[in-house]
Amino acid sequence: MTDKRKDGSGKLLYCSFCGKSQHEVRKLIAGPSVYICDECVDLCNDIIREEIKEVSPHRDRSSLPTPHEIRHHLDDYVIGQEPAKKVLAVAVYNHYKRLRNGDTSNGIELGKSNILLIGPTGSGKTLLAETLARLLDVPFTMADATTLTEAGYVGEDVENIIQKLLQKCDYDVQKAQRGIVYIDEIDKISRKSDNPSITRDVSGEGVQQALLKLIEGTIAAVPPQGGRKHPQQEFLQVDTSKILFICGGAFAGLDKVIGQRINTGSGIGFGAVVKGQSEKATEGELLSQVEPEDLIKFGLIPEFIGRLPVVATLSELSEDALIQILKEPKNALTKQYQALFSLEGVELEFRDEALTAIAKKAMARKTGARGLRSIVEGVLLDTMYDLPSMDSVEKVVVDESVIAGQSAPMLIYGQPEAQASGE
């Protein structure tokens, strides 16, 4: 085909599909006795892309990894937390198996199993959810429960969560309905007391009520392309019963609630226990014994707990686990910085005692794995600032004294006589 504006007779030409003249479009492409404009070509491409999108979910469903494969993939990125990995692997496998079989098996309707993750800050809750979404190649979005309020109040509406998920997959509803939503800080929306209050709690119990139907499964009406709702608007209809919701929170103080329950009824007189079981147990051991009644006492309403039937607890990371996190996962922090330095043609080495010092510092901060990056970033900041302006640096070495703030990283130059310390 050739680009033509007029035929040999100089007659004005029109697109054979939309009827626009050659003056109304940028290009008019001619074939044997037919013309098509650039706008119609774009429209045809859009139609083909939409058909490809509709076919792709069926292809994805045929390759569902087994629980063992899911667990092994999580092992590549998340250190420790073995019980939580096992619970997540089974729950995620069952969820997507339910979707693949159309929510029923031999006429039996299969229930939805959303997940509640309980564990201290920096224990890997968010990373587990992100890694699962990457493995399954499904849309993933995160929401902060502390920003949510009931509809009609100042704050973020719970349906905005679905809007964010749609944005991640270019507003493809079918793809969004197979996605994963992670709601963080879910413990922060617990009601303020055990007893229901006559005053409205729009950011606590009110949000729990608003999330109920969304998590259980409803048809959410979402404005297309993120616009505001108005009566004459056409909405995108999203079935949330097919979306996997994972809620996570630190639940600070929940271990004490569990401890009180365990110690209740320990007896008096000859039947008394001198020291309660909970006083000897660690926080992680207590959290692993969590029951729905403990969560209710903490401030979650029974209906909300019922929508999160799968509960996985994560323990606080030990010093050894933090050292492993620094060097073993596929995207380990030390590997990330080594890759960053290699872009400058420089080798970065972390001595073993330096890794131990970083882990000890993170333990003291009580921020778990989340605090590791800020520590490493802090000790390497000056080096990363100066390195692009320096010549002949071949290697940077970080030892224990660097982490302690007693010296700067050692710089090793290409010429032996130019070896110097960055002090």
Curated annotation (Swiss-Prot):
Any one GO CC term of the record: HslUV protease complex
Protein family per UniProt: Belongs to the ClpX chaperone family.
PROSITE patterns: CLPX_ZB
Keyword annotations: ATP-binding, Chaperone, Metal-binding, Nucleotide-binding, Zinc
Subunit structure: Component of the ClpX-ClpP complex. Forms a hexameric ring that, in the presence of ATP, binds to fourteen ClpP subunits assembled into a disk-like structure with a central cavity, resembling the structure of eukaryotic proteasomes.
UniProt binding sites for ATP: P120, T121, G122, S123, G124, K125, T126, L127
Domain ClpX-type ZB: 2-56
GO molecular function: ATP binding; ATP hydrolysis activity; ATP-dependent protein folding chaperone; protein dimerization activity; unfolded protein binding; zinc ion binding
HAMAP family with a match to the protein in the record: ClpX (MF_00175)
NCBIfam families: clpX, PRK05342.1
InterPro entries to which the protein is assigned, alphabetical: AAA+_ATPase, ATP-dep_Clp_protease_ClpX, ATPase_AAA_core, Clp_ATPase_C, Clp_protease_ATP-bd_su_ClpX, ClpX_bact, P-loop_NTPase, Znf_CppX_C4
GO biological process, any: cell division
Binding site for Zn(2+): C15, C18, C37, C40
Protein name as it appears in the record: ATP-dependent Clp protease ATP-binding subunit ClpX
Top-rank taxon: Bacteria
Main function: ATP-dependent specificity component of the Clp protease. It directs the protease to specific substrates. Can perform chaperone functions in the absence of ClpP.
Transmembrane segments: none
Gene field: clpX
Pfam families cross-referenced by the UniProt entry: AAA_2 (PF07724), ClpB_D2-small (PF10431), zf-C4_ClpX (PF06689)
